[in-house]
Amino acid sequence: MQGAAKQYMETELFEFAFWPDFFAQLDRLAEMALPEAWRFREPDYAPRNDRTPILERYLKDVFRLLAIRYNQAEETWAEEAAIMTCGRGACFHTGLFSRTYKGIYAYFIPNRKDVSMRKWHFKDFCEENSPLLKYTVPLPQRPQLIMNARSEAFHPGWPIRVNARHILEDAENLSRIPQALQSFGNLPLLLDAAVELGRRQALAEPGIIAPQFYHGRMQFLMPLYLSGRSKADLAMALSIGDGYYIGETCLTPQMAYLNARLLARPTAGWLKDLMALPSTKIP
């Protein structure tokens, strides 16, 4: 007799559960967690969520990562390490810590609301020692990304292969370049020069490089200065080759921050400069 067929998890947060007053729940999570800036000082566009748009994106990215791990798991213990589900409830580790350095979990109960067909209903964010989790054993693990030896650190001595003209032929890439430079005749040459300058800067200041996890792969984000040295105009996503990097696409600095935040709070100055001050402080 064959075992029961595997039940696959929805990978989108709003498909997994019904969230009443989602933005207010994010406000509560921001208050629980260690203080962090969850919005940009001067956003590229006006988001619907004007208080915690970065936290919103982060939580959705974390859940998607965990749901994919759940779906790929071949053993029950590996499923439960990502997202724990049972008749009583469901939960996952948000990857964030409270102000007393306890893990923060998102907890769900079975959905019995007629307004939604989702299986789960969001109940609360809670610390790892919350009574809500007393029947959850073991607790799901904190989401972590395992990097292989070649992707643990950026190697500024490696060459960067960039086809600047090909990148700039893509309308989406071109739209991310400051408008004043988009019609610049020698833009491919300018982009090539900015990449080489970024590589040389990384030799002197390794901290300017930020890692990101994109479509299941580790990449590095390198700032590009096209119009001056006061602030980065772009970030180039570098994929890891065999002893070299491949410059595949250009991102705005704010896009780079959103991607990098899934791994950790970015510490590179060119990314930190984008942020508004945290609205709360540790008591």
Regions found by a protein language model. Give the residues of each.
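An acidic, glycine-rich, mixed-charge low-complexity segment common to nucleic-acid enzymes
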Residues: 1-215
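Compact beta-sheet-dominated globular domain cores
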Residues: 217-281
